[in-house]
């Protein structure tokens, strides 16, 4: 099983809109100065998804070629719970995982990002084992080694969600790495909300060392860049524009300049829409360029 290699240059983007067609998210990315984007390939709040039409596939691939955007990420639907204790929801989730991965392969997308799941009334151990089983069922889709990596996103520690600590993510990665191409997407707001202090370079040093211990830095494949409206350890998933929350710009400067993180693709999910994303991308690129000068 071949695994998609990391990019050779820093890539920055945002979660852009597919209104009017999937291709439009790519063009919106170009218009805000992005080199990558995150999208929804289907309605994120419904179980059913439409079959991809050939015209949609061709237009999407043409947009990629025209804009030179790469390492596109799809964010899977919010209803999917790979560790659901309810057998009906679990089966729907497994079908949703399979369909999402299949569509991403068809479109030539590089990353597909999932929320790991919620234990609800079951134990976290049972939930994590179900999560492993759910993703394992999609292993045959990777027999031909498509350039796609499944990412599990860090969570903010609210409720019974899995993935708010690196030990849980490490368990999932270690149990899936020989079955599917697997990695982690670190959401800066989420890990801060979960108690990981990333407000300073030393804070990031400690966090990266802990991630390496439990998961392995080679499995850190993407970042969601968000500041936090709430303080450290609040377990609240509320995004703020970069530098306008409790995390601060120094944290994002570190990610753009440290050799371990600067080339890992980064996707903004901050409030403010395209105008703000264009400004934030410009500021992040300045951090990177100042490092090289």
From Swiss-Prot:
Its EC number is 3.1.21.2. It catalyses: Endonucleolytic cleavage to 5'-phosphooligonucleotide end-products. GO terms for biological process: base-excision repair. Its cofactor is Zn(2+). GO terms for molecular function: deoxyribonuclease IV (phage-T4-induced) activity; DNA binding; DNA-(apurinic or apyrimidinic site) endonuclease activity; phosphoric diester hydrolase activity; zinc ion binding. The keyword Zinc applies. Endonuclease IV plays a role in DNA repair. It cleaves phosphodiester bonds at apurinic or apyrimidinic (AP) sites, generating a 3'-hydroxyl group and a 5'-terminal sugar phosphate. The gene is nfo. Zn(2+) 2 binds at residues 153, 187, 224, 269. Zn(2+) 1 binds at residues 75, 115, 153. This is Probable endonuclease 4. Gene3D superfamilies: Divalent-metal-dependent TIM barrel enzymes (3.20.20.150). Keywords: DNA damage, DNA repair, Endonuclease, Hydrolase, Metal-binding, Nuclease, Zinc. It is an enzyme of class 3 (hydrolase). InterPro entries: AP_endonuc_2, AP_endonuc_F2_Zn_BS, Xyl_isomerase-like_sf, Xyl_isomerase-like_TIM-brl. Binds 3 Zn(2+) ions. CDD domains: AP2Ec. It comes from Chlamydia pneumoniae. It holds the Pfam family AP_endonuc_2. Belongs to the AP endonuclease 2 family. Zn(2+) 3 binds at residues 190, 237, 239.
């Amino acid at each position: 099983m071949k695994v998609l290699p990391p990019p050779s240059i820093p890539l920055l983007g945002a979660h852009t809109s597919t209104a009017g067609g999937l291709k439009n998210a790519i063009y919106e990315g170009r218009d805000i100065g992005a080199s990558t984007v995150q999208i929804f390939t289907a309605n994120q709040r419904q179980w059913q998804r439409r079959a991809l039409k050939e015209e949609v596939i061709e237009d999407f691939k043409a947009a990629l070629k025209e804009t030179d955007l790469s390492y596109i990420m799809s964010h899977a639907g919010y209803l999917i719970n790979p560790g659901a204790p309810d057998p009906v929801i679990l089966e729907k989730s497994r079908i949703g995982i399979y369909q999402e991965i299949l569509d991403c392969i068809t479109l030539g997308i590089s990353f597909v990002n999932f929320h790991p799941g919620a234990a609800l009334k079951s134990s976290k151990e049972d939930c994590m084992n179900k999560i492993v089983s759910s993703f394992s069922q999609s292993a045959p889709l990777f027999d031909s080694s498509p350039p796609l990596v499944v990412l599990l996103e860090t969570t903010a520690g609210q409720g019974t969600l899995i993935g708010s600590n690196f030990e849980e993510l490490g368990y999932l990665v270690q149990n899936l790495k020989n079955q599917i191409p697997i990695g982690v997407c670190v959401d800066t707001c989420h890990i801060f909300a979960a108690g990981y202090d990333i407000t300073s370079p030393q804070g990031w040093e400690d966090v990266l060392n802990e991630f390496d211990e439990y998961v392995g830095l080679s499995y850190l494949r993407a970042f969601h860049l968000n500041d936090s409206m709430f303080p450290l350890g609040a377990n609240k998933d509320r995004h703020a524009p970069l530098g306008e929350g409790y995390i601060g710009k120094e944290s994002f400067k570190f990610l753009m300049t440290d050799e371990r993180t600067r080339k890992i693709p980064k996707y903004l999910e901050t409030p403010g829409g395209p105008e703000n994303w264009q400004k934030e991308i410009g500021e992040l690129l300045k951090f990177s360029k100042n490092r090289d000068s």
